Amino acid sequence: MSDLFSSPDHTLDALGLRCPEPVMMVRKTVRNMQTGETLLIIADDPATTRDIPGFCTFMEHDLLAQETEGLPYRYLLRKAH
């Protein structure tokens, strides 16, 4: 799974930010991306383990991978539309 994180199109460093800031930054970043591009999100807020997958489901983007066993958390999403 780690290989998926090695070459994202965009990276968002949300370390030190707390809910709702990380998901708001993800939304703003995704809005400026092209369909099919990937975004690596790096975060340390425990709420992101719920919020990032929920955002992807609600906005119908693809959550390609997530690592939440230890800090920092990493998520890889692909913009679907």
Curated annotation (Swiss-Prot):
Superkingdom as given in the UniProt entry: Bacteria
Coiled coil start-end: none
Keywords on record: Cytoplasm, tRNA processing
Active-site residues from the entry: C19 (cysteine persulfide intermediate)
InterPro entries: Sulphur_carrier_TusA, TusA-like, TusA-like_sf
Keyword set includes DNA-binding: no
Signal peptide start and end residues: none
Main location: cytoplasm
Recorded family membership: Belongs to the sulfur carrier protein TusA family.
Name of the featured protein: Sulfur carrier protein TusA
Organism in which the protein naturally occurs: Salmonella typhimurium (strain LT2 / SGSC1412 / ATCC 700720)
Gene that this polypeptide is encoded by: tusA
